[in-house]
Design a protein with these regions (language model features):
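Positively charged n-region of N-terminal signal peptides that target proteins for export
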Residues: 1-6
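Bacterial N-terminal signal peptides
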Residues: 7-19
Length: 165
C-alpha cells in the first residue's frame, strides 16, 4: 500500500493545482447551486433510475430532500427524515456519524426500493437498511418498510465507511 501513497499524493496535488489554475485564469467559475435552500452537511446527491430526473440530497443529520426544479426556490420536499434517531454521539458532533450514504435499487421505478447507510448509538453501530417509497406519495419514504440488512458494531466514532452504491 505504501508504494501507492506517493503517486496518489502527486495526483491529488496536481489535480488541486490544475483546478486552482483554471479558476485563476477565468476558465471556470464556481457558482452557488440552490442559493436559497437551507442545506446542512450534505453528503450525497442521488438521482433515481426512474426517469423522473429528481435529485435527492442526503444530509448527514438524517434528512433526505428532493431538490426543487427551480434552482432559486427556497423549498425542498422532505423525502425521508431520520433526524429523531440517535445517529450522532452528541448534537454538536462534526464527525462522520449520521446518514452517510444512499442508493436506489436498479429497479427502483418498479419496486420503489432504496438503501441507506447510517450510524446509530447505544450501542455504536453502522447500519445498512432497505426502505420503500410510500405507496400513496412517490415523494415520501415509508419508514415503516425499513428492513435492516446489516449491522456492524463500531468500536470508535471515526472512519466507519462511506457511501453505498
Amino acid at each position: 500500500m505504501h508504494r501507492f501513497a506517493n503517486p496518489m499524493m502527486i495526483l491529488a496535488l496536481l489535480s488541486a493545482v490544475a483546478g486552482t489554475a483554471l479558476a485563476d485564469e477565468g476558465l471556470c467559475k464556481l457558482e452557488p447551486a440552490f442559493p436559497n435552500l437551507k442545506i446542512e452537511r450534505p453528503i450525497a446527491v442521488v438521482i433515481p433510475p426512474d426517469g423522473s430526473k429528481r435529485m435527492f440530497l442526503a444530509q448527514q443529520r438524517g434528512k433526505v430532500v428532493i431538490l426543487p426544479k427551480d434552482e432559486n426556490s427556497a423549498d425542498a420536499a422532505t423525502f425521508l427524515d431520520l433526524s429523531d434517531r440517535k445517529m450522532e454521539a452528541n448534537e454538536s458532533s462534526k464527525f462522520e456519524e449520521g446518514l452517510d450514504g444512499m442508493a436506489f435499487h436498479p429497479k427502483f421505478a418498479e419496486n420503489g426500493k432504496f438503501y441507506i447507510f447510517y450510524t446509530q448509538q447505544d450501542p455504536k453501530r453502522a447500519v445498512i437498511s432497505e426502505m420503500q417509497v410510500s405507496k400513496s406519495d412517490a415523494n415520501k419514504a415509508d419508514t415503516s418498510t425499513e428492513r435492516v440488512l446489516l449491522e456492524v458494531r463500531l468500536p470508535w466514532w471515526w472512519h466507519h465507511s462511506g457511501n453505498i452504491a
